[in-house]
């Protein structure tokens, strides 16, 4: 199965977020999943690296707009690069190409990825699939959002999100969701 991993480009190898992503990539590859990432550095690189080092297949979805903006190229662990012209096309590819998505801590881009996928699930624009958010920041952030804006989010729409704290818990939750 193809699993997209969303996450930040900022974490360095010595940081916890990078190590969590590395572990996540390893676990996913050992379970036989193809890992799809945004293809660049930080947790995208770490998940790609973990998967590649564990013998898995890694697809990196890069973007010409981002490459022009930051002069970036795909990380060394990407086995197959899918370069899209625009950020919108990249986001659509990351979401449309997977059967599940896992989100590590991140910034505006990661938040956009999570919200876009969540909304597509809500309006049934994509087939049902797990969306698992890793790390306490996601639960805190979205609980705060729901406390302030919850009247605009139906209870049935909240069921698309799953919250876990670790890479291991994410893999277990993914397995559980796939069996149901």
What are these regions (language model features)?
Residues 93-96, 154-180:
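A charged, well-structured terminal subsegment
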